[in-house]
């Protein structure tokens, strides 16, 4: 919501109304009751109709407000930067960095429809063909432009990057990071000068080993074209590999706070404190997780080890109120770059509510799940490609029973994943979902069939093709299903996942934002199915208007 909207709302509240509300956000009913009655007279032609409309108020999901409201995003104004800057060439980056990073984006983008489940190198013709369509996202434009102004200045600069899921945040911090490293090399001049840059030059901290793997897959693509040494420190990294890596030079390392602190326990490693003191650029990704009560001591201990850092970047898709308070207390000079779409569900997400308390489900979520998966298979979309669906549950104990039922009773290609699985199992399970969907050669194409009649599934707003379409075969696509908990709701860049099912309604608004954010990434269209019962159905049904009106979740 704009600052003009806030000011207008404040002017509308007069006398006892303003004092009674004590500065709280108004509900829609309160706005209808008080807003228009106390509105000042508008001269003819003095204000547009749009200016007189009530501001877009946050939608409180759950029992309590958790996320920061629109006042947080007003700390920095991205404004119309994305309208003025539409090409990476307009941003201040070294030419070699710009060229390589654009190729990386083209090789990973969910918008590049020519990609399939095969690994794609930067010199692949499919990458070259897509380069003309690669443009900076609003958050990338804002972050690169802001950091470029003082990128090489020696004092500590602390930034917070906050933007909606699927907006390109990883590249928004990677581009300044890589640009910093290459400019530092240029300033060092000779090979001898570059050798003195430090054993560890930059660091990326993430909360899970799945994210370590995901970020490292991107970093690997930078090694050869930019001559950068990248390294991942995860649960399975042998001690000898760690020691060997630091004998030379590591330009970028990605790890978790726990593994970083573990360096001090390796007797073979000489003076890990000295190694960490050489870091000049550090990123804390999924920062709201790494700075919450269960992680903050470990994370902050890592940060304090970086005694000579020039840049410290915190990156997050959600900003809880407690997180904002902690950051302001720890870093008084914090510079915020926040998207105006923060905490908003992507408008391309189609929210579908299924009341499992009603017939024909009669309280059976499993019946509703089987019906929803059937509808996804038969909806006639993703012609020629495998479909993917992620099912979120609240409790890890539910995963195995759901997987067994879907596989044994309904014959689905389904996989389950919780934090209790080993790292190797987790990585193997999510690997297909992190690659682009494969082509299906023998699929019946919808264009070859008569257009089927649509019917609505009972007690839901889901429409599917009628399988009784005059004896014609209904359109069906292979479907791969992943059942998981919130362990995979954050940061994972699922590719080709256009369907997300909330088997259990999350208790917290922050979990809702992250679960829904696994689809509709980079403004791609996606579908979200929410199962509700007698309780909570009214609030869940309010999500569709929230999405259409672009209201933030709080």
UniProtKB/Swiss-Prot annotation:
- Which PROSITE patterns does the annotation name? HELICASE_ATP_BIND_1, HELICASE_CTER
Which Gene3D superfamilies does this chain map to? P-loop containing nucleotide triphosphate hydrolases
EC number(s)? 3.6.4.13
Specify whether Mitochondrion is a keyword of the entry: yes
Q: Where in the cell is it found?
A: Mitochondrion
Give the UniProt record's GO annotations in the biological process aspect.
maturation of LSU-rRNA from tricistronic rRNA transcript (SSU-rRNA, 5.8S rRNA, LSU-rRNA); mitochondrial large ribosomal subunit assembly
Q: Which InterPro entries match?
A: DEAD/DEAH_box_helicase_dom (IPR011545), Helicase_ATP-bd (IPR014001), Helicase_C-like (IPR001650), P-loop_NTPase (IPR027417)
Keywords assigned = ATP-binding, Helicase, Hydrolase, Mitochondrion, Nucleotide-binding, RNA-binding, Transit peptide
CC annotations in GO: mitochondrial matrix; nucleolus
UniProt-listed SMART domains: DEXDc, HELICc
Domain Helicase C-terminal stretches:
368-554
Q: Where is the composition biased (Basic and acidic residues)?
A: 445-457
Indicate what this protein is called per its UniProt record: ATP-dependent RNA helicase MRH4, mitochondrial
Q: Which organism is it from?
A: Eremothecium gossypii (strain ATCC 10895 / CBS 109.51 / FGSC 9923 / NRRL Y-1056) (Yeast)
Q: Which gene encodes it?
A: MRH4
């Amino acid at each position: 919501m704009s600052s003009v909207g806030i000011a207008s709302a404040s002017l509308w509240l007069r006398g006892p109304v303003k004092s009674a509300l004590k500065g709280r956000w108004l509900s829609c009913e309160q706005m209808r009751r008080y807003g228009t009655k106390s509105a000042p007279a508008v001269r003819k032609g003095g204000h547009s109709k749009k200016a007189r409309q009530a501001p877009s108020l946050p939608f409180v999901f759950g029992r309590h407000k958790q996320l920061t409201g629109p006042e947080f995003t007003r700390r920095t104004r991205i404004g119309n930067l994305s309208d003025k800057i539409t090409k990476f060439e307009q941003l201040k980056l070294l030419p070699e960095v710009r060229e390589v990073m654009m190729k990386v984006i083209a090789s990973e983008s969910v918008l590049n429809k020519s990609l399939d489940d095969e690994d794609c190198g930067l010199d692949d013709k499919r990458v070259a063909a897509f380069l003309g369509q690669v443009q900076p996202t609003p958050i990338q434009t804002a972050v690169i432009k802001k950091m470029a102004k003082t990128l090489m200045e020696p004092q500590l600069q602390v930034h917070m990057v906050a933007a909606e899921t699927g907006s390109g945040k990883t590249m928004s911090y990677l581009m300044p990071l890589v640009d910093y490293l290459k400019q530092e090399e240029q300033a060092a001049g000779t090979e001898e000068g570059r050798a003195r840059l430090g054993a560890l030059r930059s660091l990326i901290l993430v909360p899970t080993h799945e994210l370590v793997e995901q970020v490292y897959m991107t970093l690997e693509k930078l090694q050869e074209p930019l001559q950068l040494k990248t390294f991942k420190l995860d649960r399975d990294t042998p001690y000898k590999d760690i020691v060997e890596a630091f004998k030379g030079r590591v330009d970028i390392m990605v790890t978790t706070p726990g593994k970083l602190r573990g360096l001090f326990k390796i007797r073979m490693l000489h003076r890990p404190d000295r190694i960490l003191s050489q870091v000049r650029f550090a990123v804390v990704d999924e920062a709201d997780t790494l700075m919450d009560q269960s992680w903050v001591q470990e994370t902050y201990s890592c940060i304090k080890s970086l005694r000579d850092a020039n840049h410290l970047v915190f990156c997050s898709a959600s900003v809880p109120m407690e997180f904002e308070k902690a950051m302001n207390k720890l870093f008084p000079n914090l510079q915020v770059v926040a998207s105006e779409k923060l905490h908003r569900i992507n408008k391309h997400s189609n929210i579908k509510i299924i009341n499992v308390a009603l017939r024909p489900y009669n309280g059976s979520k499993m019946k509703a799940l089987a019906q929803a998966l059937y509808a996804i298979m038969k909806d006639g979309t993703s012609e020629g490609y495998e479909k993917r669906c992620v099912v979120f549950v609240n409790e890890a104990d539910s995963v195995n029973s759901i997987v067994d039922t879907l596989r044994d009773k309904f014959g689905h290609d389904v996989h389950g994943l919780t934090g209790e699985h080993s790292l190797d199992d987790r990585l193997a399970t999510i690997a297909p979902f992190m690659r682009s969907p494969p082509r299906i050669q023998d699929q019946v194409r919808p264009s070859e069939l008569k257009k089927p009649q649509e019917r609505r599934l009972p007690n839901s707003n889901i429409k599917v093709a009628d399988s009784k379409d005059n004896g014609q075969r209904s359109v069906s696509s292979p479907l791969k299903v992943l059942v998981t908990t919130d362990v995979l709701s954050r940061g994972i860049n699922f590719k080709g996942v256009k369907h997300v099912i909330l088997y259990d309604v999350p208790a917290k608004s922050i979990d809702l934002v992250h679960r829904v954010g696994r689809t509709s990434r980079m403004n791609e269209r996606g579908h979200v199915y929410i199962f509700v019962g007698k309780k909570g159905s009214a609030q869940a049904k309010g999500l569709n208007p929230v999405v259409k009106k672009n209201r933030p979740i709080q």
